[in-house]
Amino acid sequence: MDDLTAQALKDFTARYCDAWHEEHKSWPLSEELYGVPSPCIISTTEDAVYWQPQPFTGEQNVNAVERAFDIVIQSTIHTFYTTQFAGDMHAQFGDIKLTLLQTWSEDDFRRVQENLIGHLVTQKRLKLPPTLFIATLEEELEVISVCNLSGEVCKETLGTRKRTHLASNLAEFLNQLKPLL
């Protein structure tokens, strides 16, 4: 496990939860995750769940992705998706507004790995360098990804070679995120 990435993710999650508590006097609330089982759920309303992060309980790797492509995945990606269970968190990096993706449960973790495999299949078909997404943007064709060759974080337009460098590594990126409620 990459300790710098794990700590940066935990620190951002704490900043996010603290900001939520400061503004709403509660743990984060999600309508999107209502009805989806998770160890993160504290309580449920008629149409939403209050959640708090919980330690990840499965195998701490994305080996299913590695096996599917017979490649080695950046250790930071293993760490990012297996440090904790949490709800997705809205954030800002410079002037970029994003939704930081998280795994909500062990079932969700399997789904995330399947989506990462699908992403890599498309990149391989288009002969693009491999990246692994960590966040979504309002523009559906853009994501924040980690380059599997260099470990750098970039803003990527899906299906193209268009990439904008954002940070040298995932810990640096996470440390610069600001919670957005």
Swiss-Prot record:
Family the entry assigns: Belongs to the Syd family.
Function of the molecule: Interacts with the SecY protein in vivo. May bind preferentially to an uncomplexed state of SecY, thus functioning either as a chelating agent for excess SecY in the cell or as a regulatory factor that negatively controls the translocase function.
InterPro entries the record matches: Syd, Syd_sf
Signal peptide per UniProt: none
GO CC annotations on file: cytoplasmic side of plasma membrane
The keyword Membrane belongs to this UniProt entry's keyword annotation: yes
Alphabetical keyword list: Cell inner membrane, Cell membrane, Membrane
TM spans (from-to): none
Membrane protein topology class: Peripheral membrane protein
Protein's UniProt name: Protein Syd
Gene3D superfamilies in alphabetical order: Syd protein
Keyword Membrane set for record: yes
Primary location recorded for the protein, binned into one broad class: membrane
Pfam family of the protein (one): Syd
Subcellular location: Cell inner membrane
